[in-house]
Amino acid sequence: MSITAQSVYRDTGNFFRNQFMTILLVSLLCAFITVVLGHVFSPSDAQLAQLNDGVPVSGSSGLFDLVQNMSPEQQQILLQASAASTFSGLIGNAILAGGVILIIQLVSAGQRVSALRAIGASAPILPKLFILIFLTTLLVQIGIMLVVVPGIIMAILLALAPVMLVQDKMGIFASMRSSMRLTWANMRLVAPAVLSWLLAKTLLLLFASSFAALTPEIGAVLANTLSNLISAILLIYLFRLYMLIRQ
């Protein structure tokens, strides 16, 4: 059976339109969870203000130089802020991936689905999804730090791993290995979608500061919701593609 990207795009668009409100609510809930967790675990405003005290930003040649010029207390505050942002983002992404994939499974089985039901049904797989997304993010970030291109390649090769983990109940490393093999064999179908997703997320990041015109909290929720919707579209595409490849 010949699979064309155009047919998968069409199926993705139809599913997204038909389930838009449910996907929007899941995206909004995940964005809210991400922002709340980030706020809870982040340093206080007073602590964050200390980061600017006595640090010669203009004279620093790079990020590592800037960090080296910080006091141990400032470095600890920066580490806490970075860890809070990373942890809350990973939690939100894991819930989003689990929720969206469960929506697809439930709808495909002819069952009625709501945002809360999808998230609740995904609860048993969230720990494995969290670890998978953490490892994937780590590998992609390391690749981007090296020469950028390896990170993009890793993002493409591991794209199907969450779908395989949930749909086929694979282990974390088994899903990563299987994703690499299957994606490599179907690069022409996976790569354009992942690259479009990366481009859309980058463009959103460039305009993210404009959302803060509302209030920082509302702006963060809105930006995260839009980011989640972009990721949801990619997940729908990858799930549909994986089902067609398996046939």
Swiss-Prot record:
Q: What is the lineage of its organism?
A: Bacteria, Pseudomonadati, Pseudomonadota, Gammaproteobacteria, Enterobacterales
In the record, the note on similarity to other proteins reads: Belongs to the UPF0259 family.
Q: How does the entry describe its membrane topology? A: Multi-pass membrane protein
Q: Which GO terms describe its cellular component?
A: plasma membrane
Name of the molecule in the record:
UPF0259 membrane protein YciC
Where does the sequence pass through the membrane? 20-40, 87-107, 118-140, 152-172, 187-209, 225-245
Species of origin reads Escherichia coli (strain 55989 / EAEC)
Q: NCBIfam families, per this entry?
A: PRK02868.1
The subcellular localization recorded is: Cell inner membrane
Keywords (alphabetical) are: Cell inner membrane, Cell membrane, Membrane, Transmembrane, Transmembrane helix
